[in-house]
From Swiss-Prot:
UniProt protein name: Transmembrane and coiled-coil domain protein 3
Signal peptide span: none
Segments passing through the bilayer: 409-429, 450-470
Coiled coil: 63-83, 112-149, 284-398
Gene Ontology molecular function terms on file: 14-3-3 protein binding; identical protein binding
Location, primary (coarse class): endoplasmic reticulum
Species of provenance: Mus musculus
């Protein structure tokens, strides 16, 4: 064994069994792959017990992962609530449009007020949910950015603490634990594996025993050579470390042989061998026994080295498997995160499209309402034009009827005047006929009337000359 420092680590599994149980339950609950090492490894009649513990860095990593998962669940829940609110708002808009299309002005005003209240309430709730969603996204980004650095720092701190405690505990146990050769043979090292380091409790005690007895495990070959050259008459030889093998001088009598044997334990609990007997056979038997024990120790050391190498290989394999699993989990997490981002972007695009469709529907409804109002206005204007035309036509008809009545009255009056004039003419003619009729009774009367008329005509024709002549006669010069 190249040294005893290989086994100087701390087994913290037995110091806190409650913490071990909690860590194990957390690991099992979150599907962590634990080291699957055999429970018992038989080497030289010793039992090897394997235990494991989960470091605080992995727990912090799982804590960050749990927080991130809970935030993602909250984000999905808030997103679904936003979709529900938007769906209800769209339903309210459709219902409002349906009711407004078949309602009069008063009902339309009331429906509009109710719709505005509902729309404001929905918009307020959607705004609150969006703020909450932004807060969750911000917290998730903070956890993703700060959680990894924090967990790596905690892992480094925990590893330093473990190394410090391992050195302290190894020093204390090396000073206080009782060691003896028989106990080292009966109790072989028990191995407990604590990720990311593995710990050998009893191998540490055994290494301390070898180091305290022979100085170092490297001095076993030197001890073998020295024991082969050992003789009872040889001077005391020190084999390094804190233990020595002393050969005392022979006693002169059998009493001294019976009472001269003494063995004392040194400060490390190792037996110091003295020259208790004068017989070379006894000393050679002891040497053979020690050599046999050293061979067993060497075989045990070789087996321990093989076990350590096998555990190293298995640990590397398990570590690679865990690293690969963590990489796969990280890849799956990144893929799920990308899918979540894509889903969020899709929902945002759908929300934007719905907003655009709602705006276009509002514009369409407003345009249709404007077109309908314009058509109604044009119809009203055409009706008013027709009514005005009918009124003018009626007035013209009334005027024509009035003119016709007046013409009839005037015609009647004219006819009456003509009749009256003809009546007067007839009266005059009849009167003249009455005057003329006596003059036309006989030829003499006719001639007389003719001559009278002729004279009257001449007299009328020469009336001016007659007047002049009369004036000349009447007015003298």
């Amino acid at each position: 064994m190249p040294g005893s420092d290989t086994a100087l680590t701390v087994d913290r599994t037995y110091s806190d069994p409650g913490r071990h149980h909690r860590c194990k339950s957390r690991v099992d609950r979150h599907d962590m792959n634990t080291l699957s090492l055999p429970l018992n490894i038989r080497r030289g009649g010793s039992d090897t017990n394997l235990n494991f513990d989960v470091p605080d860095g992995i727990l912090d990593f799982h804590k960050v992962k749990l927080n991130a998962d809970s935030l993602r669940q909250k984000i999905l829940k808030v997103t679904e609530q936003i979709k529900i609110e938007q769906t209800s708002r769209d339903g309210n808009v459709a219902e409002y449009l349906k009711l407004v299309s078949s309602a009069d002005k008063q009902q339309a005003g009331r429906i509009k007020q109710v719709f505005e209240k509902k729309n404001q309430k929905s918009a307020h709730s959607i705004a609150q949910l969006q703020k909450k969603l932004e807060q969750y996204h911000r917290k998730l980004r903070e956890i993703e950015q700060n959680g990894v650095t924090r967990s790596s720092k905690d892992i480094s701190k925990d590893s330093l603490k473990e190394i410090h405690h391992s050195l302290k505990d190894a020093h204390v146990k090396s000073r206080t634990a009782p060691h003896c050769l028989e106990s080292s043979k009966s109790s072989m090292p028990g191995v407990s594996l604590t990720p990311p380091v593995f710990v050998f409790n009893k191998s540490r005690e055994f290494a301390n025993l070898i180091r305290n007895k022979f100085g170092s495990a490297d001095n076993i070959a030197h001890l073998k050579n020295s024991l082969e050259e050992f003789r009872p008459e040889a001077s005391p030889r020190a084999y390094g470390g804190s233990a020595t093998i002393v050969n005392k001088p022979k006693y002169g009598s059998d009493d001294e042989c019976s009472s001269g044997t003494s063995g004392s334990a040194d400060s490390n609990g190792n037996q110091s061998f003295g020259a208790g007997g004068t017989s070379t056979l006894d000393s050679q038997g002891k040497i053979a026994k020690i050599m046999e024990e050293l061979r067993e120790i060497k075989v045990t050391q070789t087996q321990l080295a093989e076990d350590i190498e096998a555990l190293k290989v298995q640990f590397k394999r398990e570590y690679g498997f865990i690293s690969q699993t963590l990489q796969e989990e990280r890849y799956r997490y990144e893929r799920l995160e990308d899918q979540l981002h894509d889903l969020t972007e899709l929902h945002q695009h759908e929300t934007a499209n719905l907003k655009q469709e709602l705006a276009s529907a509002e514009e369409k409804v407003a345009y249709q309402a404007y077109e309908r109002s314009r058509d109604i206005q044009e119809a009203l204007e055409s009706c008013q034009t027709r009514i005005s035309k009918l009124e003018l036509h009626q007035q013209e008809q009334q005027t024509l009827q009035t003119d016709a009545v007046n013409a009839k009255v005037l015609l009647g009056k004219c006819i009456n005047v003509v009749l009256a004039f003809m009546t007067v003419i007839l009266v005059c003619v009849s009167t003249l006929a009455k005057f003329v009729s006596p003059m036309m009774k006989s030829r003499s009367h006719i001639l007389g009337t003719f001559f009278a008329v002729t004279l009257l005509a001449i007299f009328c024709k020469n009336w001016d000359h007659i007047l002049c002549a009369i004036e000349r006669i009447i007015i003298p010069r």
